[in-house]
């Protein structure tokens, strides 16, 4: 079956740049030109000029398309500046040629990100109505549909966020969190499809390395956000209660107000965050990230062509039954609840389960189960952050004796966080029991 891999040029100014790149790599290829356009009932449309490069060697098994034009989506023009590689995924020589072309294209001066090759589906993606069962390769009778439909769109989104973060110098703080969440979700889905994708562990580790680049900055952002909330809401008990309830409806703040603005701590963290940002952004180049994600997509497309007798629904049901039973069977005892290392492992399992479940619309889990799962994950996250921050802030105070107010400010922050963590801990057993009951009922429905 034919597979497609699309590279969108983020800094390409005209079609000649795209055509020139491909002509240099495929000098003997036959070139033909065609105009593609399509209009949709909601006034969206696309129109572009396509140059097709067909290698002259018989049975090459691949071709390259250079597309230049525009999409009109919600009255907004979006550039089309694509190099699309079409190839037979069961042809080893064609796959090898595509792999080499990827390496050569991404080694140049032009910058690329992955994008949806089908322009009609790209419009859907931009409008937020990207339905997997509309994709060309979607087949309910084949479990390997998960590889070619449930993962690629996540790669497109991650690659574009990397573009925004790296090209923007990391200034937009929300991008750091969004990217970390999407990388975690990708790792969760790779775990889910592991029986279909033997190289899943290798690619999960590579994705983890990308996420690790973001971790230091994100940790500083969490602390800075807490400092700001403490400064804004610390003077009033009712405000503190309101703030805590915003973080989680199940966590009730029990402490009174805290005075002080924590300026020394905040300024120190901001400086350290800026240093971490410069280090993180300097570690990666956009084309290097794109090459890693494109290589993962290529590996997924190859694996999707392998024989599989199981249907998509049967595969997902079996996997989630297995994961769900393991969660329900976790030993949950009162004396384990202050073992933060153990709770962190449980939290990782819950996050993996939730992110994977959210990525599989075919399973249609109940809103009550998803909400209970999120509350439980939030509680464990609050406990873990409190545990990690306690150790980090103690080291920070010890390293800065020259700041006399720092110890006082850290003590205020720790007291505020500790009270929230204690409140979460009181609710934890009841929330776990509720989640386990809902999960057990859902597992029975999957039988």
Each predicted region: which residue ranges?
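Function-determining surface determinants
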Residues: 1-447
């Amino acid at each position: 079956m034919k597979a497609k891999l699309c590279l969108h040029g983020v800094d390409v100014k005209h079609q000649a740049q795209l055509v020139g790149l491909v002509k240099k790599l495929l000098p003997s290829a036959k070139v033909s030109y065609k105009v593609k356009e399509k209009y949709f009932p909601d006034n969206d449309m696309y129109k572009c000029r396509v140059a097709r490069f067909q290698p002259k060697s018989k049975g090459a098994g691949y071709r390259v398309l250079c597309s230049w034009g525009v999409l009109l989506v919600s009255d907004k023009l979006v550039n089309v500046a694509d190099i699309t590689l079409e190839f037979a995924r069961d042809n080893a020589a064609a796959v090898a040629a595509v792999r080499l072309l990827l390496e050569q294209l991404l080694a140049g001066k032009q910058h690329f990100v992955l994008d949806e090759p089908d322009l009609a589906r790209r419009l859907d993606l931009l409008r937020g109505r990207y339905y997997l069962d509309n994709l060309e390769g979607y087949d309910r009778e084949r479990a390997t549909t998960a590889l070619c439909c449930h993962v690629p769109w996540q790669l497109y989104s991650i690659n574009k966020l990397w573009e925004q973060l790296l090209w923007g110098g990391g200034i937009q703080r929300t991008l750091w969190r969004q990217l970390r969440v999407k990388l975690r979700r990708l790792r969760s889905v790779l775990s889910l499809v592991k029986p279909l994708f033997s190289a899943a562990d290798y690619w999960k580790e590579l994705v983890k390395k990308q996420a690790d680049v973001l971790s230091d900055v994100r940790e500083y952002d969490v602390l800075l956000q807490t400092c700001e909330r403490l400064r804004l809401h610390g003077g009033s008990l009712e405000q503190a209660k309101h703030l805590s309830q915003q973080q989680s409806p199940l966590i009730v703040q029990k402490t009174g107000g805290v005075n002080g603005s924590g300026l020394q701590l905040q300024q120190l963290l901001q400086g350290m965050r800026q240093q971490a940002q410069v280090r993180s952004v300097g570690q990666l180049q956009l084309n290097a990230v794109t090459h890693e994600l494109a290589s993962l997509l290529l590996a997924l497309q190859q694996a999707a062509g392998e024989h599989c007798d199981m249907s998509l629904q049967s595969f997902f049901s079996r996997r989630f039954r297995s994961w769900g039973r393991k969660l329900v069977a976790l030993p949950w005892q009162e004396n384990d609840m202050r073992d933060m290392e153990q709770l962190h492992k449980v939290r990782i399992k819950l996050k993996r389960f939730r992110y994977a479940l959210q990525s599989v619309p075919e399973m249609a889990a109940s809103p009550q189960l998803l909400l209970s799962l999120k509350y439980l994950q939030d509680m464990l996250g609050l406990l873990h952050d409190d545990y990690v921050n306690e150790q980090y802030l103690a080291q920070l105070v010890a390293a800065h004796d020259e700041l006399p107010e720092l110890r006082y400010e850290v003590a205020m922050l720790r007291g505020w966080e500790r009270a929230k963590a204690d409140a979460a801990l009181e609710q934890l057993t009841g929330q776990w029991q509720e989640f386990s009951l809902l999960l057990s009922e859902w597992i029975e429905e999957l039988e």
